[in-house]
Amino acid sequence: MRVSEDTSTKEVFERVAADFLQLYKRCVLAQTREVRSSDRERCEELVRRNALARELCKLHQTLCFVYENDALYGIVLDALDLEGIYGRVEEGPGADDYQDRLVQELLRYFKDEFFTWCDKPLCARCGTAKKQAAVGHGKPTVEEARYRCTVVELFRCEDCGDVARFPRYNDPLKLLETRTGRCGEWCNLFMLILRSFGIEARYTWNREDHVWCEVYSNALKRWVHVDSCEKSFDEPHIYSVNWNKAMSYVIAFSNRSVKDVSRRYIVRNRLPRDQIDEDDLQFLTKYLTKLLRLQLPDEERYLLHCRDELEAIDLLGSKTAPMEIPPAAGAAGRQSGSADWKRQRGEDGR
C-alpha cells in the first residue's frame, strides 16, 4: 500500500510539473511573439535622450546582421587551410568536445599563421616600421570607403619622409585580403570565420575600446569567451586581472540576441556605470533581442529564452564567485601590441 501511495504521489507531482512547464512555455511565447507599441515608444524616447543607447542601437544594426551572409562563407573557407585545421583538430590535444577543439584550433591558426598585428604600417621605401611616426588622420579614398573605412591613420618615416596610410577597414571580407590590423580587425574577421564554420558566436564590445568574441559551447551549455588577439579560450578574467584593465560596460551582439555580459568580465577595476540607467539598459537589450527573434519559430524562441535564463543565473554568480585563474594564463599584461601602445591603453598589467 505504501509503494502504491508513493507512486501515486510521484505521478501527481510529475503531472503538476508538466502542466506548470506548459503554462510557463505559453507565457514565454506570448510575451515574445510581438512588440508592444509602448515598448517601441520607450525605446525611441531612450534613444533620443541617451548617447549610450544610441550607440548600442547603432551597433545592433550592424553587428547583428553583417556576419549572417551565406554568400561570404564559401569565400572565407576557400582562403583557409581547411585540411591542416581539421587534421590538427582530429589529432591534437584540447577540449573533449569537437566544436570546442575546433574553436581552439582556429584561434591558434588565426594568430600563428593567418593574421598579423599592425602597430604601424611598413614604410614602402625603407621596408620597416621602426621609424614610423604617427602624424594624424586622413580621409579615406573612394576605394577605401567601399570597404567601410571611415578613418585612415597617417605615418611619416623619420628616415626617408615617406607617408604611409593605414586604412581601418570594417568590411570583414576586405580583411580577408589585407590580413592585418589591431583588435577591431582581428575580432571582425574572426567573427566571420566562426560563423563560416557554422559556430554560434557573439561579437563582444567593451566601451573602453576592446572587442572580442564569444561562442556557445554545446558541451559546456554556456557562452565561452574567445579572444583571437590573445589566442584565449574561456578566460574571461584576463582583461580585469591579467591586463589590469578598467572597464564599465561589456555588451554581446549576435543575430539572436543583445546581452549585457559585464558581470562575466569585470571582476576588478570597475569603472562607474553612469552612462545609462540600469533599468533602461536592461530594457533596451531585451527589446533589441525581442526584435531579432520575432520571426523565429516558437520552439527556437522558447529554447533561446531558456538559455537566456540560465545565462542570467550564471552572470549573477560571476559577480560574487571567487575568480580562479589557471596558471597557464597568469602572465601579466596584454600579449598583442607594442609595449608603448599597451601602456597608453592601460592594458600592460600594471
Swiss-Prot record:
Q: Which cofactors, by name?
A: Zn(2+)
* GO CC annotations on file: cytosol; nucleus; PNGase complex
Name the record gives this protein? Peptide-N(4)-(N-acetyl-beta-glucosaminyl)asparagine amidase
What does the record list as coiled-coil region(s)?
Answer: none
Record's family? Belongs to the transglutaminase-like superfamily. PNGase family.
Organism this protein belongs to = Eremothecium gossypii (strain ATCC 10895 / CBS 109.51 / FGSC 9923 / NRRL Y-1056) (Yeast)
Q: How is the cofactor bound?
A: Binds 1 zinc ion per subunit.
Q: Where is the active site?
A: 183, 210, 227
